[in-house]
């Protein structure tokens, strides 16, 4: 069948799907998210986190690495969050650390999203041995805690943002792949997919233009949860002393507080509060999105 014939036939079949207009569908989904208290709270927390990250140089003009006060000074008007063991302003550290932590989480999510979506689409549509291989791979990663795998890699090759991103990304994609596979399996025999196959559409076209739009909502929920998991993992590595000492992040600040928990509570409380707010933002939005999509 010629491409023009395929396109015209596809256009004739499109109304039968009863798919809402994409802009209207997006608006209704956003409205459903904001109608829930968790969605509103998550959006407020997310906007707060993003504003702090992007406006860090204007919100905290003090160099986070400058020795600007008395070491281990409690919160005062001069240093609203106190100072660390070297006399550096903790507020500047928390504000500037937001950018690095969010960039790490975004990079990990991008790696996991690219790998998980592509593999899940192929495995779900093709099945067979690929399906068995994905199941075994996922079980392997689930049997070994992610934090343990990352800690082993960092212990062997040394700390670094690139190693952290690659390790977290490559250990996070199996979960996304399973979600995508499950969604593809539930729609691969739908009428609109069978119609596309009957019209001669290629497997690549079906996977990326027909099946992918149907799995994106579920993927968005998983990515939101993944952001929170990455932030928590990065903070845990920092607390264990496995963070990158050359990158100012919330995890590094939490790690620096380890030896002063009894005498300087603010060193752990304020970075921990920032991490909690960011994790809540992504988890609450993911929960609201899942509810808006009917629990998919």
Regions found by a protein language model. Name each.
Residues 153-156, 184, 232-274:
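Glycine-rich helix-loop "coupling/hinge" segments at transmembrane-helix boundaries
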Residues 161, 170-171, 217-227, 265-296:
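C-terminal transmembrane helix and the adjacent membrane-cytosol boundary/short C-terminal tail
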Residues 56-59, 104-139, 151:
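Transmembrane-helix boundary motif in ABC transporter permease subunits
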Residues 80, 84, 124-125, 130-186, ...:
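Generic hydrophobic transmembrane alpha-helix motif, especially the helices
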Residues 22-37, 62-109, 252-272:
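Periplasmic/extracellular loop-to-transmembrane helix junction in inner-membrane transport proteins
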Residues 83-88, 125-126, 195-214, 254:
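Short helix-to-coil transition segments within interhelical loops
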Residues 99-115, 150, 154, 204-234, ...:
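Transmembrane alpha-helices
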Residues 17-65, 137, 215-216:
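N-terminal signal-anchor/first transmembrane alpha helix
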